[in-house]
């Protein structure tokens, strides 16, 4: 099959397949990828928790570094991916290659800068992310290999998102799942069999992500994608580079504020000792796993929304958003029910310390209620980002961990003490829900009007 044939087949798949079947086919591998990624994050928490409470706290500190890596990768991946998908929807394959190449090589450059700066200032960097003096040696040992692999990790996120936006979620899944499973297998080998401790967890993450990078790059080099990577295709137009940054701004805001929010959470929790930092870290990792389901369904929506918006099939964009809302809510209800009935056992699985459990358990229960609001937040943000409404998408992306969370984490612990630390995230989620809902409802009505206008201008069928 020629490149042109693949492009035509992909166009018909994305614009004609019934919405429920299309989204589920794209969401299933994405959800699996997200779950595996979350599981290997939980595996790090589990194995590092076997060392000490201070080592367990290091996971929370380094998670803020991971959020920075994700912020850069998702900014370039989502930013180029939404443009690529819309260009493919309008059948412009040359532009797709141009934007793909630009984002990939930019990701490598950003990763090198992060690695150099991070390694040169490592102890101060870890303290800035919320480490205590007792956590610091573990955090530095854990972060060092991850920083070395940062260029490949950021580039992998770009490739993964481009594959998804092309509608090739199965190929994206192969790279991420392989890396995730390898990470889970390598953790105990490096940490305990080789006696490397927390440094072993970092080495396992870096090595598995390097292999994931190689697998994803192979997909592009072997012509399994419509867009391709060519250094000669990197855009020379500042306007196009700014389009990538604007399209990725919601992801950068979301992930960047996740890093800042995590840092502030660690700083607020460390006033109550290493057990508080470890407890909040465990809760955050568990809910990253739960939220990965909603985000996975939302990522199944993104290429569908982008492709069909570019093809001016607005009714399909609306149907896709509504179906995603329903599917994400049902899946979250099931997950929360299971976790609620096993809450204490779940927390003790990662660190069997009464002090850690005393902090984590109330925070976990508060979060269980708030997480059911996430489908509206996720669908609103991802829909706007996918159709190129960068301003609205960026604002909503900044609400959860920025506009709502940061004022709360600065005020509530001073007023309510440790309870304030535990309540910040669920209250921020509730506020973000009430902000996102009217934006989403208004846009769904707008899509309906745009579809009617498009139908009225369509040529009569003979």
Regions found by a protein language model. Give the residues of each.
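Residue-level signal for short hydrophobic patches within transmembrane helices
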Residues: 16, 20-39, 43, 65-72, ...
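Transmembrane alpha-helix boundary and packing residues in multipass membrane permease domains
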Residues: 30, 34, 46, 63, ...
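Short alpha-helical transmembrane segments in multi-pass integral membrane proteins
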Residues: 1-27, 84-151, 193-249, 305-370, ...
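Short runs within selected transmembrane alpha-helices of multi-pass transporters and secretion channels
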Residues: 77, 146-164, 172-180, 201-216, ...
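Helix-terminus/linker motif at the lipid-water interface of multi-pass membrane proteins
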Residues: 35, 39-57, 126-133, 189-196, ...
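Small-residue-rich hydrophobic transmembrane alpha-helices
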Residues: 56-116, 153-172, 279-343, 374-396
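Hydrophobic transmembrane alpha-helices of multi-pass small-molecule transporters
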Residues: 68-71, 183-188, 213-217, 289-292, ...
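Transmembrane helical elements of multi-pass membrane transporters/channels
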Residues: 25-44, 145, 179, 208-212, ...
């Amino acid at each position: 099959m020629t490149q042109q044939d693949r492009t035509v087949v992909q166009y018909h798949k994305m614009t004609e397949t019934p919405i429920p079947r299309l989204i589920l086919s794209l969401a299933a591998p994405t959800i699996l990828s997200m779950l595996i990624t979350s599981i290997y994050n939980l595996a790090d928490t589990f194995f590092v928790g076997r060392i000490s409470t201070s080592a367990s706290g290091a996971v929370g500190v380094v998670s803020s570094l991971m959020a920075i890596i994700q912020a850069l990768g998702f900014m370039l991946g989502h930013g180029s991916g939404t443009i690529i998908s819309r260009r493919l929807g309008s059948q412009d394959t040359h532009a797709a290659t141009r934007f793909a190449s630009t984002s990939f090589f930019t990701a490598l450059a950003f990763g090198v800068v992060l690695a150099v700066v991070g390694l040169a200032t490592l102890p101060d960097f870890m303290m800035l992310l919320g480490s205590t003096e007792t956590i610091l040696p573990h955090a530095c040992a854990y972060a060092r290999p991850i920083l070395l692999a940062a260029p490949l990790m950021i580039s992998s996120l770009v490739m993964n998102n481009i594959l998804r936006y092309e509608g090739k979620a199965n190929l994206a899944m192969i790279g991420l799942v392989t890396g995730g499973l390898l990470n889970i297998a390598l953790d105990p080998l490096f940490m305990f069999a080789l006696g490397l401790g927390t440094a072993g967890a970092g080495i396992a993450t870096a090595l598995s992500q390097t292999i994931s990078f190689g697998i994803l790059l192979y997909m592009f080099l072997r012509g399994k994608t419509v867009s391709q990577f060519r250094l000669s295709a990197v855009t020379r137009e500042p306007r196009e580079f700014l389009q990538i940054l604007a399209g990725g701004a919601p992801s950068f805001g979301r992930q960047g504020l996740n890093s800042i929010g995590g840092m502030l959470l660690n700083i607020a929790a460390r006033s109550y000792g290493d057990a508080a930092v470890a407890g909040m870290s465990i809760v955050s990792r568990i809910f990253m796993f739960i939220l990965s389901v909603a985000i996975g369904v939302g990522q199944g929506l993104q290429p569908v929304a982008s492709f069909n918006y570019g093809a001016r099939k607005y009714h399909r964009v609306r149907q896709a958003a509504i179906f995603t809302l329903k599917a994400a809510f049902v899946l979250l209800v099931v997950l929360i029910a299971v976790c609620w009935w096993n809450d204490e056992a779940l927390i003790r699985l990662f660190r069997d310390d009464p002090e850690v459990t005393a902090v984590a358990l109330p925070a976990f229960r508060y979060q269980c209620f708030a997480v059911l609001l996430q489908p509206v937040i996720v669908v609103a943000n991802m829909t706007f980002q996918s159709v190129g409404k960068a301003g609205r998408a960026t604002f909503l992306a900044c609400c959860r961990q920025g506009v709502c969370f940061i004022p709360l984490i600065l005020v509530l612990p001073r007023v309510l003490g440790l309870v304030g630390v535990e309540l910040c995230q669920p209250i921020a989620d509730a506020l973000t829900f009430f902000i996102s809902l009217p934006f989403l409802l208004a846009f769904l009505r707008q899509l309906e009007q745009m579809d009617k206008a498009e139908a009225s201008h369509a040529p009569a069928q003979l």
